[in-house]
Protein backbone atom coordinates (compact mmCIF):
# COMPACT_ATOMS: atom_id res chain seq x y z
CA UNK A 1 0.00 0.00 0.00
CA UNK A 2 1.28 3.47 -0.88
CA UNK A 3 2.17 5.57 2.15
CA UNK A 4 0.21 8.85 1.98
CA UNK A 5 1.86 12.26 2.13
CA UNK A 6 0.51 15.40 3.77
CA UNK A 7 1.95 18.72 2.64
CA UNK A 8 1.66 21.82 4.81
CA UNK A 9 3.54 24.67 6.44
CA UNK A 10 5.65 24.23 9.65
CA UNK A 11 2.71 25.14 11.91
CA UNK A 12 -0.22 23.21 13.36
CA UNK A 13 -2.84 24.97 11.25
CA UNK A 14 -5.56 23.06 9.47
CA UNK A 15 -3.34 20.04 8.88
CA UNK A 16 -3.55 19.32 12.62
CA UNK A 17 -6.92 17.67 12.00
CA UNK A 18 -5.85 15.02 9.44
CA UNK A 19 -2.48 14.54 11.18
CA UNK A 20 -4.16 13.67 14.48
CA UNK A 21 -6.54 11.37 12.60
CA UNK A 22 -3.72 9.48 10.87
CA UNK A 23 -1.75 9.23 14.12
CA UNK A 24 -4.75 7.97 16.07
CA UNK A 25 -5.60 5.37 13.45
CA UNK A 26 -1.97 4.20 13.33
CA UNK A 27 -1.53 4.84 9.61
CA UNK A 28 2.03 5.67 8.60
CA UNK A 29 2.41 8.75 6.44
CA UNK A 30 4.99 11.22 5.20
CA UNK A 31 4.85 14.86 6.16
CA UNK A 32 6.15 17.25 3.52
CA UNK A 33 6.90 20.55 5.24
CA UNK A 34 7.05 23.62 3.02
CA UNK A 35 7.77 27.25 3.87
CA UNK A 36 5.91 28.63 0.85
CA UNK A 37 3.76 27.32 -1.99
CA UNK A 38 6.04 27.01 -4.99
CA UNK A 39 4.77 27.41 -8.54
CA UNK A 40 5.09 23.65 -9.11
CA UNK A 41 3.15 22.88 -5.93
CA UNK A 42 0.49 25.47 -6.72
CA UNK A 43 -0.27 23.68 -9.99
CA UNK A 44 -1.26 20.58 -7.98
CA UNK A 45 -3.68 22.47 -5.73
CA UNK A 46 -7.28 22.71 -6.90
CA UNK A 47 -7.94 25.88 -4.88
CA UNK A 48 -4.28 26.97 -4.55
CA UNK A 49 -4.38 26.15 -0.81
CA UNK A 50 -2.84 23.64 1.58
CA UNK A 51 -3.11 21.07 3.09
CA UNK A 52 -2.61 18.60 0.28
CA UNK A 53 -3.14 14.87 0.79
CA UNK A 54 -1.57 12.55 -1.74
CA UNK A 55 -1.79 8.78 -2.01
CA UNK A 56 -0.14 7.51 -5.16
CA UNK A 57 -1.74 9.38 -8.06
CA UNK A 58 -4.71 10.43 -5.94
CA UNK A 59 -4.62 14.00 -4.61
CA UNK A 60 -7.15 15.90 -2.57
CA UNK A 61 -7.29 19.27 -0.81
CA UNK A 62 -9.62 20.90 1.75
CA UNK A 63 -9.40 19.67 5.33
CA UNK A 64 -12.96 18.26 5.64
CA UNK A 65 -12.55 16.28 2.40
CA UNK A 66 -9.22 14.85 3.59
CA UNK A 67 -10.76 13.90 6.93
CA UNK A 68 -13.70 12.24 5.19
CA UNK A 69 -11.46 10.25 2.86
CA UNK A 70 -9.19 8.96 5.63
CA UNK A 71 -12.17 8.12 7.86
CA UNK A 72 -13.93 6.25 5.05
CA UNK A 73 -10.79 4.23 4.38
CA UNK A 74 -10.61 3.18 8.04
CA UNK A 75 -14.37 2.68 8.55
CA UNK A 76 -14.34 5.47 11.13
CA UNK A 77 -17.30 7.52 9.88
CA UNK A 78 -20.18 5.79 11.68
CA UNK A 79 -22.15 2.62 11.03
CA UNK A 80 -25.40 4.08 9.75
CA UNK A 81 -26.26 6.90 7.38
CA UNK A 82 -27.78 8.77 10.33
CA UNK A 83 -24.54 8.52 12.32
CA UNK A 84 -22.53 9.65 9.32
CA UNK A 85 -24.87 12.61 8.81
CA UNK A 86 -24.59 13.63 12.46
CA UNK A 87 -20.80 13.30 12.33
CA UNK A 88 -20.70 15.49 9.21
CA UNK A 89 -23.00 18.01 10.90
CA UNK A 90 -20.62 18.28 13.85
CA UNK A 91 -17.56 18.51 11.60
CA UNK A 92 -19.15 21.46 9.80
CA UNK A 93 -19.61 23.14 13.18
CA UNK A 94 -15.99 22.41 14.13
CA UNK A 95 -14.75 24.00 10.92
CA UNK A 96 -16.87 27.09 11.64
CA UNK A 97 -15.28 27.36 15.08
CA UNK A 98 -11.84 27.13 13.50
CA UNK A 99 -12.68 29.83 10.94
CA UNK A 100 -13.98 32.17 13.67
CA UNK A 101 -10.89 31.70 15.82
CA UNK A 102 -8.34 32.04 13.05
CA UNK A 103 -10.13 35.07 11.68
CA UNK A 104 -9.90 36.94 14.98
CA UNK A 105 -7.01 35.57 17.02
CA UNK A 106 -4.09 37.33 15.34
CA UNK A 107 -5.71 40.77 15.73
CA UNK A 108 -6.54 40.59 19.45
CA UNK A 109 -4.92 42.00 22.55
CA UNK A 110 -5.77 40.51 25.96
CA UNK A 111 -8.76 42.79 26.48
CA UNK A 112 -10.18 41.83 23.10
CA UNK A 113 -9.58 38.14 23.86
CA UNK A 114 -11.58 38.50 27.06
CA UNK A 115 -14.42 40.17 25.17
CA UNK A 116 -14.32 37.39 22.56
CA UNK A 117 -14.61 34.74 25.29
CA UNK A 118 -17.59 36.48 26.91
CA UNK A 119 -19.42 37.38 23.70
CA UNK A 120 -18.05 34.53 21.68
CA UNK A 121 -19.55 33.60 18.32
CA UNK A 122 -18.28 30.07 18.98
CA UNK A 123 -20.15 29.70 22.28
CA UNK A 124 -23.25 28.30 20.56
CA UNK A 125 -21.15 25.52 19.01
CA UNK A 126 -19.56 24.57 22.32
CA UNK A 127 -22.99 24.50 23.95
CA UNK A 128 -24.31 22.32 21.14
CA UNK A 129 -21.44 19.82 21.37
CA UNK A 130 -21.76 19.77 25.16
CA UNK A 131 -25.49 19.05 24.90
CA UNK A 132 -24.93 16.13 22.51
CA UNK A 133 -22.23 14.64 24.75
CA UNK A 134 -24.48 15.05 27.80
CA UNK A 135 -27.09 12.88 26.09
CA UNK A 136 -24.82 10.47 24.20
CA UNK A 137 -21.39 8.99 24.70
CA UNK A 138 -20.28 10.03 21.21
CA UNK A 139 -21.02 13.02 18.98
CA UNK A 140 -22.47 10.90 16.17
CA UNK A 141 -24.81 9.36 18.79
CA UNK A 142 -23.83 5.80 17.90
CA UNK A 143 -22.30 2.98 19.93
CA UNK A 144 -18.72 3.72 18.89
CA UNK A 145 -16.53 6.77 18.49
CA UNK A 146 -16.07 8.27 15.05
CA UNK A 147 -13.60 10.71 13.55
CA UNK A 148 -15.69 13.65 14.75
CA UNK A 149 -15.00 12.90 18.43
CA UNK A 150 -11.30 13.17 17.69
CA UNK A 151 -11.86 16.32 15.62
CA UNK A 152 -13.74 17.87 18.56
CA UNK A 153 -10.65 17.23 20.68
CA UNK A 154 -8.47 19.04 18.12
CA UNK A 155 -10.95 21.93 18.14
CA UNK A 156 -10.91 22.30 21.93
CA UNK A 157 -7.13 21.98 21.94
CA UNK A 158 -6.89 24.77 19.34
CA UNK A 159 -9.26 27.13 21.11
CA UNK A 160 -7.52 26.56 24.45
CA UNK A 161 -4.11 27.14 22.89
CA UNK A 162 -5.31 30.41 21.33
CA UNK A 163 -6.72 31.61 24.66
CA UNK A 164 -10.21 31.86 23.16
CA UNK A 165 -12.17 29.29 25.17
CA UNK A 166 -15.71 30.72 25.45
CA UNK A 167 -17.11 31.49 28.88
CA UNK A 168 -19.19 28.73 30.43
CA UNK A 169 -18.76 25.18 31.67
CA UNK A 170 -18.06 22.36 29.24
CA UNK A 171 -17.21 19.31 31.38
CA UNK A 172 -17.93 16.78 28.63
CA UNK A 173 -15.71 18.55 26.11
CA UNK A 174 -12.93 18.95 28.69
CA UNK A 175 -13.22 15.24 29.52
CA UNK A 176 -13.02 14.44 25.80
CA UNK A 177 -9.88 16.56 25.51
CA UNK A 178 -8.22 14.78 28.44
CA UNK A 179 -9.17 11.39 26.99
CA UNK A 180 -7.44 12.00 23.67
CA UNK A 181 -4.48 13.82 25.21
CA UNK A 182 -3.67 10.69 27.19
CA UNK A 183 -4.17 8.37 24.21
CA UNK A 184 -1.04 6.27 23.51
CA UNK A 185 -1.63 6.68 19.77
CA UNK A 186 -1.47 10.48 20.02
CA UNK A 187 0.93 11.08 22.89
CA UNK A 188 4.17 11.04 20.88
CA UNK A 189 2.80 13.27 18.13
CA UNK A 190 1.28 15.78 20.56
CA UNK A 191 4.63 16.15 22.28
CA UNK A 192 6.53 16.67 19.01
CA UNK A 193 4.10 18.77 16.96
CA UNK A 194 4.97 22.37 16.01
CA UNK A 195 4.86 24.77 18.94
CA UNK A 196 2.74 27.44 17.30
CA UNK A 197 -0.48 29.18 18.26
CA UNK A 198 -1.82 28.54 14.78
UniProtKB/Swiss-Prot annotation:
Fetch the CDD domains from UniProt: GST_C_Sigma_like, GST_N_Sigma_like
Query: A GO term (biological process) for this protein?
Result: glutathione metabolic process
Q: Does the keyword Transferase apply?
A: yes
Question: Which keywords annotate this record?
Answer: Transferase
GST N-terminal domain location: 2-78
Q: What is its EC number?
A: 2.5.1.18
The job of this chain, per UniProt, is described as:
Conjugation of reduced glutathione to a wide number of exogenous and endogenous hydrophobic electrophiles.
Q: Which InterPro entries match?
A: Glutathione-S-Trfase_C-like (IPR010987), Glutathione-S-Trfase_C_sf (IPR036282), Glutathione_S-Trfase (IPR040079), Glutathione_S-Trfase_N (IPR004045), GST_C (IPR004046), GST_superfamily (IPR050213), Thioredoxin-like_sf (IPR036249)
Encoding gene (name): gsta5
Q: Which reaction does it catalyse?
A: RX + glutathione = an S-substituted glutathione + a halide anion + H(+)
PANTHER family linked to this entry: GLUTATHIONE S-TRANSFERASE
- Does the keyword ATP-binding belong to this entry? no
The organism's lineage is: Eukaryota, Amoebozoa, Evosea, Eumycetozoa, Dictyostelia
What name goes with this protein? Answer: Putative glutathione S-transferase alpha-5
| One term of GO molecular function | glutathione transferase activity
Where does the chain bind glutathione? 8, 42, 49-50, 62-63
**Protein family (similarity comment):** Belongs to the GST superfamily. Alpha family.
Domain GST C-terminal intervals: 80-198
Q: Which Pfam families match?
A: GST_C_3, GST_N
Amino acid sequence: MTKPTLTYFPVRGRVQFPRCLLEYLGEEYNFNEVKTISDDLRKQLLFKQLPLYQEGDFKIVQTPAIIDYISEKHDFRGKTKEERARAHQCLAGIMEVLDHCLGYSFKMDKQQQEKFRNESPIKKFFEGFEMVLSQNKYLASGEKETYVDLMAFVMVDYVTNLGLMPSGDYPKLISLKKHYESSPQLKKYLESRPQSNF
